[in-house]
C-alpha cells in the first residue's frame, strides 16, 4: 500500500482571518457593515483621545448603485480631526493584519490590532476595491494612498500615492464593501446614538444612504485625560510573558565592526591611531564610569581576548558561555572558530555576566513590574525560594514555571495601578443620560478601581426612570472602554447581573420605564470574541457590577417610595374633596338641621396640607 504524505503549510495572519472572518465580526453583509462602521469610528475617537483633541467625526455610507437591492456594495467613509498618521506608517497600518499602535498595556477602544484592517480585507474580498486613506499629520501636506492587501503575504500593495496641500490635520478612510443597510441600519443608528451618550465631548455626524443626516453635537467640552501605558502587574503574567521580558532585559552583544571601533575610540578620547592593548585598557579603566554600556561590553571582550583594535577587527564574537566561563569567536585570518577561558575574578567578568545572564531577580521585579519596590521584591524572592541575586537569564524552564506560579500566588503585591485608566466620570455620564432620556429620576456611581488577573478596571453605572424612557424596562445599555455593545447581549456579564436582580425588592414591578447604563473601562477588557460584543463573567468584574447596581437600585427604591407617598397624598386630597361635602350633607339630614356645618375651611386646610406634602415629596425626588 502506498502511503500519502501529509503536506504542512504556514499561513499568514491575514490569510487566517480571510478564512475565519466570522471571529472578528464579519460573518454576513449585515454584521460586516455594522462592524466596519464601529472599527473606523472607534479608531477615530481613540486617535483624538490620545492627543486630547475634542473629536469631530463624520460618518458617511453611500450606495454604489442605489437602485440595486440589498445586499449590495456601499462606500463607507469616516473622517476625523485627529492627529493623522505619518505617511511612512500608512501602508502597514491599513494593509497589514495585526499591525498597529494598540498592543501596549493601556485603556483603548481597540485592542486586537485587526479591526480596521479586517474591514479593509472584507471590502477587498467582496468588491475587489482598494482602501483610500487621506492623512495630514503636519497640518500642511495631505498624503493620499490607495492600498490593497496581499492576503498570502500579509503585506500592503500600494496602488496609488499622491500628495497635496492641506490646511488642517486629520484622517479620512474610505472603503467599498458589500453590506445590507436595510437590516444593519437600525444597529448603526443605535451605535452612533449610544456612542454620543458615552462620549458627550465628541461631535458625531452620520449621513445615511437614504440622504438622512443624524447629528449629535457635543454637549460637554471637557475631555477626560488620555489613558497611559503602564508596566504589567505580577498577577497578570504567564511563563511566555516572563520569557519575553527576560529577553528584553538582556543586552545584545554589539557587532564589532569599523563603526563600533570608531565609537570606542571616540568615547575613550583616543587620538593616536595605533595603540597597544595595554594602553587601551589603561585609558578604559580611567573612563569606565562615564562609558556607555555598548562600549563597556567591547572593552570587557577585549580584556579577555587580549587584542588591540587592529586584531579585534579581524574576528567575530560567536558565543559567551557563562556557565563554562568560555568565550567563542571566529578568526577570519585562520578561518576557524576559537575559544578562550574567562577569569571569573576579573573586574570585567561581571559586565559580561550582566549582558548575557540578564538582571538579578530583585532588579527585574522592580524595573519590569508596576508597584514593586525593593522590600517587596526581597519578600517575594524568599516566598519563591529564589536567591535575590539570581540572574534571570540563568533560570531553567522549570524555574520559569515555578516563578510564574509564585507571582500568581504571592499576596503581598500592591493592587494594580489604576491611574492609567480614563473613566468617563460620574458627572458627564449623568449629563448624557439626562440629555438623551430626560428622566424623572437619575442616579450614577463610579466604583473604586479594582483588578482582575492583574489588570485594573473601573465600573461606572447609571440608572434612570420615567421621562422619555419607554416602558418595558429595564433597558440595558452596555459599554466597554466607551464602545457600545449591541450584539450578543445574552452571554454578557452585565445582562447576567441585571437578570439576577430581584427588582420587586426595589419596588420596581411590571415593565416600568427605566434604563441601566453600564461602562467598564480597563487596560484589558475580557471580551469573549475578537468581535468585541460581550464581556466574560470574570468574578471580580461581576462583583463590582453587582455592587454598583445594588447601590443604584437602593436609590431607585427610595425614589419609588417617595413617589408613592406623593401619589398617595394627592389621592387623599382628592378623596377629601369628593367625600367631605357628601358626609356634611348626610350628617345635616340625619341631625334634622337645615344648615350644613362649615366644612369648607377644614377641607381647604386639609387639601392644602396634603398638596404641600405631595409637592415636598416631588421636590425631594426631583433633587435626587
Description of each model-found segment:
Residues 66-77:
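Short, highly conserved beta-strand within the GHKL-type HATPase_c fold
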Residues 74-75, 100-236, 336, 386-403, ...:
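GHKL-type ATPase core
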Residues 1-56, 88-92, 223-225, 230-237:
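Bergerat-fold GHKL ATPase/HATPase_c domain
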Residues 80:
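Acidic ATP/Mg2+-coordinating residue in the GHKL
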Residues 84-86:
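A short glycine-centered beta->alpha linker in the GHKL/HATPase_c
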Residues 152-156, 179-201, 210-252, 363, ...:
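Charged regulatory segments coupled to nucleotide-binding catalytic modules in large multidomain enzymes
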